[in-house]
Amino acid sequence: MDKIIKSIAQSGAFRAYVLDSTETVALAQEKHNTLSSSTVALGRTLIANQILAANQKGDSKITVKVIGDSSFGHIISVADTKGHVKGYIQNTGVDIKKTATGEVLVGPFMGNGHFVTIIDYGTGNPYTSTTPLITGEIGEDFAYYLTESEQTPSAIGLNVLLDENDKVKVAGGFMVQVLPGASEEEIARYEKRLQEMPAISHLLASKNHVDALLEAIYGDEPYKRLSEEPLSFQCDCSRERFEAALMTLPKADLQAMIDEDKGAEIVCQFCGTKYQFNESDLEAIISDKA
């Protein structure tokens, strides 16, 4: 089961989140049938949103949009504070690798664009923030957002590793944030440790990558695990929700679906679930609109 572990340095100077998001990203790949680069780009976005959602309280919903002018198109993710996340990528078929190493490439082909976050607190006044894409690797772009928009210096590492068949092997990441009151000495010590950390890909390849991430972040410094919470890919779409959407269409459009298509099929963008509405269903909706 996927999870996020929240922790804090005993000194109170820093906190860290580490995530195992393997099942989340694997299910997203399965539902959207993504190729290698699309899988990694979508997966990184889902992990970034899992981190962002873990920072929120109550019943907030968080939308992350990675909008570039590349062949990936838009990447959209929605998460809640209960560990659920869903998402999709417009172009599922991007498959770009280094010829020599087989490394899956994302950043060099993301293009110019923006990292957009929308936090809906349920009050009717969502908070929206937009920052430019810095590298297109998504992790660095997320860190830049946290520093610029939330004024919280943060170190982010996230990635998705694929097997020889381009299926998700492991996915996860971490966030380290400076807390108020941290001394210059403490900040310098952590910056040095982060600079010396192995690459996120190397840590994820460890047998127990969650423990490997924590060890790399804290080293010999004492820390406390605050909580361990489940994570999952979960879509909240339903037939009822799409039926309500059909109710908003003009009667003429609904009648055209009956006359021309003998019904309607609606596919959820976030999870690929198909909902069928036959002629009788559409006639009932028209009747209810009367």
Curated annotation (Swiss-Prot):
InterPro entries (UniProt xref): Heat_shock_Hsp33, Heat_shock_Hsp33_C, Heat_shock_Hsp33_N
GO cellular component terms given for this protein: cytoplasm
This protein's UniProt keywords: Chaperone, Cytoplasm, Disulfide bond, Redox-active center, Zinc
Main location: cytoplasm
GO BP annotations, alphabetical order: protein refolding
Pfam families assigned to the protein according to its UniProt record, in alphabetical order: HSP33 (PF01430)
GO MF, one annotated term: unfolded protein binding
Signal peptide positions (record): none
Disulphide connectivity of cysteines: C235-C237, C268-C271
Modification(s) after translation: Under oxidizing conditions two disulfide bonds are formed involving the reactive cysteines. Under reducing conditions zinc is bound to the reactive cysteines and the protein is inactive.
Places the protein is found: Cytoplasm
Task performed by this protein: Redox regulated molecular chaperone. Protects both thermally unfolding and oxidatively damaged proteins from irreversible aggregation. Plays an important role in the bacterial defense system toward oxidative stress.
Family: Belongs to the HSP33 family.
HAMAP family according to UniProt: HslO (MF_00117)
Listed name of the protein: 33 kDa chaperonin
